[in-house]
From Swiss-Prot:
Cross-referenced PANTHER family: PHD/F-BOX CONTAINING PROTEIN
UniProt organism field: Danio rerio (Zebrafish)
Protein name, per record: Lysine-specific demethylase 7B
Entries under Gene3D superfamilies matching the protein: 1.20.58.1360, Cupin
Cofactor(s) it depends on: Fe(2+)
Expression (tissue specificity): Predominantly expressed in brain.
Length: 577
């Protein structure tokens, strides 16, 4: 059996996951970490001499800089080529440009005003700026928290993505190497860290995300704990940028909304409204071969400049196109979240990413899977609204329609591109059919003779998140449906229990065990007559009496406990508990 070829001073086999560099003399390959050559630094080497060869041949030869305005600084500066984004000339020119003030579009608010109820009523269409974070529910390290502190909490050996700003190129390095770079008296280049997600580190305990991002987040509300797909972690980022760092115009992945808080330093945001015209221009610009040579802010009617100073929090809604300049060394925290308020725009952004062939690394993880989970939950929400004679808010009806269209298209696409993100317990065609029925019911005005109540998040179910439902008092017996434990493949699983308002004054008394048993039996018989109804989270019995796997957080919504806390678990028609 042939043995693997060994490389480097460490004499290890080739490892695709580690950066390596070839010696131009002996032609052996070396791990950058073994010979102290960082990946971002290797591009500056013209002729590399390994530690063995530089004894006889002298040190490696470096490339010679010939310009300050191109990503490739070795190109001759003959004045024929335009300035490229991120270069030192570009940053200087950007700082000299004039822009309409962000005050024209920013909504200054107190943290306590930024609530789910407020955004449901007024929409989340414009960026919100909050100067005092306390009432937002945002908890962060103190303002003297340093880059070294990040290393202490995250670990110096964590491999992070770093952007070489002047080249707008991504590379990997260990956090301890970035810390060394940051504190070096003369930094050889501008490096920017914008994608250090630290949910899986000790630093996660120091940060509590804003209430609004937690309460409205699809992942927090709808992602089931037993999902086959790994849970997306996009809520806790630490951004470490040195002066003159620049990130070119982009829309956050999957059309996520984003919160940013500048702990110290300063960032300047260049914000563009996601109008249909601007989105079309953005897509055209993103796919053009000379994208880096065109400043997108000049292509649109208005690009607003917004300075975010120390201690300030910025909330950017779905689809806003933005670039960011770090005007002084800066540490910021941020996070991304999908929500129910702008479902259509989120889907438009995702479809644009697909058309632009955005690499998976830069997309929202398992975006389609979460849309299926959300659809399953919103079906329950629409049913509850109908049964409680509530009219769901307009944004939700529009959102569900957009979701139905997207889900249909994804199913069609699966025929030619089988890369399914449909969770295995969801019957996709049935789910789409039931959602469509609920929307038709609303649009045809089949609401009986009673006038429908316009929905308020405090009264009706559809705008209450899993968290809010969990905190509500228990619901009356009328809503009792299928109060069995959901059996999962591996174990009983309790997601957020969803409770509902119980009017103590004039509501019906809590039912007796016999009442519950009788009602439960009637439900079961009724369902069995109608045939299996898998998408109904309140039922989940197959005809053979066995439990379906139910795996959405709000499927567990059906598990509403009453004052008497009786649980009925059916197994082959027998009550076993």
């Amino acid at each position: 059996m042939a043995t693997a070829q060994l490389y480097c001073v460490c004499r290890q086999p080739y490892d695709v996951s580690r950066f390596m560099i070839e010696c131009d003399i002996c032609k052996d390959w070396f791990h950058g970490s073994c010979v102290e050559v960082e990946e971002h630094y290797a591009v500056d080497i013209d002729v590399y001499h390994c530690p063995n060869c530089d004894v006889h041949h002298g040190p490696s030869l470096m490339k010679k800089r010939r310009n300050w305005h191109r990503h490739d600084y070795t190109e001759p500066d003959d004045g024929s080529k335009p300035v490229q984004a991120g270069t030192s000339v570009f940053v200087r020119e950007l700082q000299a440009r004039t822009f309409p003030s962000g005050d024209e579009i920013l909504q200054p608010m107190h943290g306590g005003q930024v609530t789910q109820r407020y955004l449901e009523r007024h929409g989340f269409r414009y960026p919100i700026i909050v100067s005092k974070r306390e009432e937002l529910g945002l908890r962060l390290p103190p303002p003297d928290f340093s880059i070294k502190d990040v290393e202490r909490y995250v670990g110096g050996n964590k491999v992070i993505d770093v952007i070489d700003v002047a080249r707008q190129a991504d590379s990997k390095m260990k956090l301890k190497a970035f810390v060394k770079y940051y504190y070096s008296p003369q930094r050889p280049k501008v490096l920017n860290v914008i994608s250090l997600e630290f949910s899986d580190t000790k630093m996660a305990e120091l940060v509590v995300v804003p209430d609004i991002a937690q309460k409205m987040s699809w992942v927090e509300n709808y992602w089931p704990d037993d999902s086959y797909f790994p849970k997306p972690f996009v809520q806790k980022y630490c951004l470490m940028g040195v002066k003159d760092s620049y990130t070119d115009f982009h829309i956050d992945f999957g059309g996520t909304s984003v919160w940013y808080h500048v702990l110290w330093g300063e960032k300047i945001f260049y914000l563009i409204k996601p109008t249909p015209a601007n989105l079309a221009l953005y897509e055209e610009w993103s796919s053009s071969p000379n994208q880096s040579e065109v400043f997108f802010g000049e292509k649109v009617d208005k690009c607003y400049k917004c300075v975010v100073r120390q201690g300030t929090t910025l909330l950017i809604p779905t689809g806003w196109i933005h670039a960011v300049l770090t005007s002084q060394d800066c540490m910021a925290f941020g996070g991304n979240f999908l929500h129910n308020l702008n479902i259509g725009m989120q889907l438009r952004c995702y479809e644009m990413e697909r058309r632009l062939k955005t690499p998976d690394l830069f997309k929202f993880p398992y975006f389609e899977a979460i849309c299926w989970y959300v659809a399953k939950n919103l079906l329950e929400t629409l049913k509850e609204s109908r049964e409680e004679n509530c009219l769901p808010p307009e944004y939700l009806i529009k959102g569900v329609k957009a979701l139905i269209t997207a889900l249909r298209n994804w199913l069609k696409r699966e025929v030619t591109e089988p890369a399914s993100e449909v969770p295995d317990h969801i019957r996709p065609n049935h789910l789409i059919k039931m959602l469509t029925k609920e929307i038709q019911y609303l649009e045809n005005g089949n609401c009986g003779n009673k006038p429908m109540k316009l929905q308020e998040s405090s009264i009706c179910p559809s705008t209450r998140s899993a968290h809010e439902r969990g905190s509500h008092a228990r619901k009356t017996a009328r809503r009792l449906r299928g109060h069995h434990h959901h059996h999962h493949r591996h174990h009983h699983h309790h997601h957020h229990h969803h409770h509902h308002n119980h009017q103590h004054s004039d509501g019906p008394k809590a039912p007796s065990h016999l009442d519950i048993y009788e009602q439960h039996t009637q439900e079961v018989l009724k369902r069995l007559e109608m045939g299996p109804y898998e998408e109904d989270a309140s039922f989940n019995l197959k005809v053979n009496g066995k439990f379906n796997k139910v795996s959405t957080a709000s499927a567990a919504a059906a598990e509403r406990s009453l004052e008497n806390d009786l649980r009925l678990v059916l197994c082959n028609g027998q009550i076993v508990r």
